[in-house]
């Protein structure tokens, strides 16, 4: 059974001025990428199975009221970045599904995507990382799926969430260190702090009274 993300050690609270500065810092200053590391046979098998699971997508929400509330709230916040309402809802449903499937908080994943790609589907970093979650191309070969397209919405989110889950497991739930691994900057504070700032200031979610009924 996966551990709940709420049990993971989080970063200490940051002063408001620091949060604002991190939110609007140039993304290029924090450019990084996952680093290639040989995998044990068991880890390779687990990652390959996770990425390869293409079962039909079902609802990842507790019920329809929660789904309606969450999608409406997040859609409003994301409208300027993804103007097309159909594409925006498909993106949000996919983020919620893939994050929940990997045992991650969807709000954390939204914060990470904001920092990694600014919600640009076809973003490519100077290191070659691709798509919404800036996945390095070596992963598709590493897990034995060299034909996977990292610019495909569900594929990119599946890889990104699976990789972050893998790093969380390596770091025994230490989110700070897992984010450092994800960005290729393990031990440095800038990237984890920036994701935390985006998560706290842009993507925190509290259910409305309607959704709680």
Placement of each model-derived feature along the sequence:
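Catalytic glycan-binding domains that act on GlcNAc-containing polysaccharides
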Residues: 53-213
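Sec/Tat signal peptide C-region and signal peptidase I cleavage site
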Residues: 27-31
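N-terminal secretory signal peptides that target proteins for export/translocation
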Residues: 1-9
């Amino acid at each position: 059974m996966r551990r709940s993300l709420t049990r993971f050690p989080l970063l200490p609270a940051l002063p408001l001025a620091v949060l604002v500065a991190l939110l609007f810092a140039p993304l290029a200053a924090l450019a990084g990428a996952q680093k290639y590391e040989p995998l044990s046979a068991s880890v390779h098998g687990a990652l390959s199975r996770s990425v390869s699971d293409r079962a039909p997508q079902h609802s990842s929400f507790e019920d329809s009221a929660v789904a309606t509330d969450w999608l409406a709230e997040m859609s409003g916040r994301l409208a300027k970045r993804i103007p097309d309402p159909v594409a925006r809802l498909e993106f949000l449903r996919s983020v919620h599904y893939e994050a929940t499937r990997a045992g991650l908080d969807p709000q954390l994943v939204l914060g990470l995507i904001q920092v990694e790609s600014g919600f640009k589907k076809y973003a490519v970093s100077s290191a070659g990382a691709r798509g919404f979650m800036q996945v390095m191309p070596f992963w598709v070969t590493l897990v034995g799926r060299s034909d996977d397209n990292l610019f495909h919405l569900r594929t990119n989110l599946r890889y990104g969430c699976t990789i972050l889950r893998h790093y969380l497991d390596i770091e025994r739930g230490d989110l700070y260190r897992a984010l450092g691994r994800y960005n290729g900057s393990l031990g440095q504070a800038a990237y984890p702090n920036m994701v935390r700032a985006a998560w706290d200031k842009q993507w925190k979610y509290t259910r409305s009274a309607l959704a709680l009924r």
